[in-house]
Structure formats: structure tokens, C-alpha cells
Amino acid sequence: MKLIKGILFSFFVFSLSSASWARQALTYDIYRLAVQSESRLERDIKRDETRHPREVLAFFEVEQGQRVLDLFSGGGYYSELLSYVVGGKGEVIAHNNQAYLPFAKEDLDERSYAVRLPNVTPLLSEANDLELAADSFDRIFYILGFHDIYYRDETWPEIDDNKLVANLFRSLKPGGIVAIIDHDAVVGAGKETAQEFHRLSSEHVINKMTQAGFVLNDSADLLKNEADPLTISVFDKAIRGKTSRYMLKFIKPLAN
């Protein structure tokens, strides 16, 4: 009898493990299908080599049916990938402000959300004017833009960092994830690197996010580039498109 119980227990554990593995494999396959979609733009595919989108989507646990905010989405590289993953029952809000549009125009014209990606809703708003419903997003992607909070220029409206991050916290569902990727700077460097190099040390992001109530759940070195000196502009020809970038996964704690 003990032998039979042992066999049954082992089979039960094996079945659970197999089911868990199968779910993980199926989920990861969703990311592969998104990246390999024949509908993707050629300009996006050329960027994949240094961006590793399949691994990024997996790291931030994007799933079917989710509602995702792509904050300062630019030309929409991630908005399109997210739209494939969340599917018809999900939605992607592709946000930009007015200053982004001239730089993203060529990409956005070809992206043609209304025709190609009906589950993507463009949102044009300055950061300080964002109106986001409470607990309305499962994921928030903030890719290569956090440093712009501390950038100052006559063509770039000043951003209230506390107001923006508090807005993100309020609009994210409990248990939801904020995905942040940005150009790294030298450890200990001040926020002035955002102005000078369009970079920001991860410590500033972590401090600002945790002060607002987020919890840093994980980080990854997937996009790290040891050849990046971290002390030149991200637009320098020597490093453009190949900067060393950090990946930070923040979670909004579940309500008590």
C-alpha cells in the first residue's frame, strides 16, 4: 500500500511539474510568435538584435488579455509587440507627448495603428496632464524614457516627477508590473547626466519608484554592454543603438 501511495504521489508531483512546464513553454511561445510575426515592420526587426524583445516580454510577464500602458511609446516598437501578445481581449495604450511626434512621425506613419493594430489606442498627452483611471493597467512599459523626466529644454515640457510616478502607482492594478529600461550612467552620477548624455543611473529610478510605493521585484543584465563607457551621449555614433541598459521590474503591492 505504501508503495502504491508513493507511486501515486510521485505521479501527482510529476503531473503538476509537467503542467507548470507546459504553461511556461506555451507562454514563452507567445513571445516567440510575436517577435516572428510576418506583420512586423522591417525597421523593427533590424532593432531586435540589440533589444532582445522576446526575453524582455518574458521578463516583464506580459500575458494575453492584459491592458498595458506604453508610456512615451515613441515610434511604437514595443506597442506593436505588446499588441500581439495581449491579443484581441487585451489593449495597449500607446502614449506620446507632442514633443515626441516629430521624431516618431516616420515610424508612426508606417505603424498605422488604426489599420494594422486595432487593439492599440494612441494617447497624446503631456506627462503632467495624464488622466489615468485608478487600477486600470496590468502592465506599464516605460522604455528608454525615465531619464527624460529630468531633461530640460524649451521644446520639452518640464515634468513633475512626483506627480507622474504617483499617477503610475494609482493607475496600476495591485500586483501589476512597471517595466523600466533605460540608458545606464556611471554609478553615483547625479541626475544631470539626463541633460548631458540622455542617461540616468538606475539608483535614481529605484529611489523614485520605491518612494512612491513600488517594490523592486527583479532586475536583469540582459541589455548590459561592457563596451559602453557610460560617459558619452546615447546619440554618439560610437554607441547609438548599443548603449548599456538596465532592466528593472517594479510591482505594486497587493492591497492589505
Regions found by a protein language model. Give the residues of each.
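Core SAM-dependent methyltransferase catalytic element
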Residues: 212, 227-256
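A short glycine-rich, Lys/Arg-flanked "PGG" loop and its adjoining helix->strand segment in the class I
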Residues: 83-84, 155-174
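Glycine-rich SAM-binding Motif I of class I
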Residues: 76-80
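Short glycine-dipeptide loop
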Residues: 65, 88-90, 172-178
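Conserved class I S-adenosyl-L-methionine
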Residues: 65-74
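A short acidic, Gly/Pro-enriched loop at the edge of an enzyme's catalytic core
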Residues: 130-140, 144
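S-adenosyl-L-methionine
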Residues: 104-130
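Class I SAM-dependent methyltransferase Rossmann-like catalytic core
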Residues: 30-59, 63
